[in-house]
């Protein structure tokens, strides 16, 4: 089940998020999910 979350980002972080999401063909929400999953995998090593 998906839940809604509201976050506050600096302009530069938001611009980077939008650019990365656009380049990968993902929504901002999906981009954040991918980034968190990748971070989690990196921490497990």
From Swiss-Prot:
Database matches in Pfam families: RHH_1 (PF01402)
Induction entry: Represses its own synthesis.
Keywords noted in UniProt: DNA-binding, Plasmid, Plasmid copy control, Repressor, Transcription, Transcription regulation
Annotated GO MF terms: sequence-specific DNA binding
Domain of life: Bacteria
DNA-binding region coordinates: 16-36
Gene Ontology biological process terms, A to Z: plasmid maintenance; regulation of DNA-templated transcription
Recorded GO CC terms: protein-DNA complex
SUBUNIT field: Homodimer.
Similarity comment: Belongs to the transcriptional regulatory CopG/NikR family.
Biological role: Regulates the plasmid copy number. Binds to the repAB promoter thus controlling the synthesis of the plasmid replication initiator protein RepB.
Protein name (database record): Protein CopG
Origin species: Streptococcus agalactiae
Gene name of the encoded protein: copG
